[in-house]
């Protein structure tokens, strides 16, 4: 099992984002899977392990693609105001989690905190 960094600030950030030491790497939105081998994210800042995620198997990939194709059939007939509401809610979550996401981006990518916040802001602006 991978060790999560002992840095208190990063540990708090991971907790705020509900990231554990081992995380499922595959999700259909309703189901997650963690049957693949673990890949560990290592911070270039201090060389410490951040967390691990399971690799998606070919079978899991096919399931995700099939589920996405089925979801698209529902999404495309949903009225624009309802689709807009989904996008608005997603945007609200990004805004709510901007600081911890920015911290994680900076730690995981070796960027400054301001650059990490900027990356998240770009997602919000889209």
Language-model features: locations:
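Terminal low-complexity tails and localization/encapsulation signals of metabolic enzymes
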Residues: 1-52, 85, 89
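Glycine-rich loop-to-alpha-helix module at the N-terminal edge of alpha/beta enzyme cores
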Residues: 36, 50-126
């Amino acid at each position: 099992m991978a060790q999560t960094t002992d840095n208190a600030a990063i540990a708090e950030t991971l907790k705020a984002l509900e990231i554990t030491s081992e995380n499922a790497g595959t999700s259909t939105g309703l189901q997650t899977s963690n049957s693949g081998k673990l890949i560990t994210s290592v911070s270039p800042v201090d060389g410490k392990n951040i967390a691990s995620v399971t690799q998606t198997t070919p079978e899991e990939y096919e399931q995700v693609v099939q589920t996405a194709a089925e979801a698209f059939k529902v999404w495309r007939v949903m009225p624009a105001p309802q689709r807009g509401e989904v996008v608005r809610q997603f945007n609200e979550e990004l805004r709510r989690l901007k600081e911890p996401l920015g911290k994680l981006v900076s730690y995981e990518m070796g960027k400054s905190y301001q650059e990490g916040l900027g990356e998240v802001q770009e997602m919000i602006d889209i």
